[in-house]
Amino acid sequence: MKRLTGLICFLCLLCSCREEAGRGVEQPMSQPIVSETASPDSMEVEEILPFERKPLTAADIILAKELLFDKYTLKDEYPYQDTVRSFKWDAIRKCLAFIENLQYDANRWAIFQNYKNVNREAPLVRKYTQNVYRRIADTLGVERYQSVPLYLPSDTLVPERYGRDGALVSFLGETGSFYRVSPVSIEGEWWVPRRYVKLLSDSTQFNHVVVVDRGDQNIATLERLEEGTWAIRGMNPATTGMHRPPYAQETPLGMFVVQQKKSRMVFLKDGSAATGGYAPYASRFTNGAYIHGVPVNVPRTAMIEYSWSLGTTPRSHMCVRNATSHAKFVYDWAPTERSLVIVIE
């Protein structure tokens, strides 16, 4: 079976998802057909060539508005202050076409996992820097904390770069204490110590996708109905992470898997071990980034449905803040380890 020839470059995903080409579907070997009109002594044999599926492009993707959550619904284009914001449907179609094409490959999927360094702090990469948060990062800006070390097949002593927690990868096999993987968002084959990789079920399909636009501060939920056809389940305002060292960070761009859910995600006050409050209906996709409802700060305990700040400017620490009822919708609707979160700009 022909493997995907190009992987997503999520630097391109800042504005749109790259269209993928070059994936075929392996079919059974061709079989001869005997002409019904031919005589037994002069049978003509026609050979049917193997069918090769043509990769989908953005133009092949059909989006149908079939909302399951219809509160605070935004229009395709809507005014914001002195400008116009929108849902970037062309970019979203490219992302969905990429996902469709991905799933025709016979790969087994896996996830990078190292939330709060639970699987051990990643070793230092060959070349690193210290960022404005005073944390070690590779030369591409991916922090060591909560990340996964990626080794070149030619050098398994010192990692070359880091992979983000929650990133979707294709499992290629195993060699010694390493898994060989091909991340969706990073080109090439990499070796990763087994402890940092969670293998998903062979039957895993990604039919639920959440697209977060940190440029226009909105969120779209989409569900696959059949090949090339996706239903839009919600179009809502959201608030993403802001760049404010040393505590608040931008929501990272890329494609991630929903890994964990908490009905109440407790958070701490900045620079303190004291509880600051909780965020309801939290679905975690990378590091400490969750899709969640409006935060509830102590001493309050009752949930808050909506905030005037939703859909305005980045305000979160890294999370994607939603109306609480919409966060509950995502919490109930998107199955863990079978749903994708794509962050674009």
What are these regions, as identified by a protein language model?
Residues 14-16:
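C-terminal motif of bacterial Sec signal peptides marking the signal peptidase cleavage site
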Residues 174, 193-301:
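Gly/Pro-biased beta-strand-loop elements
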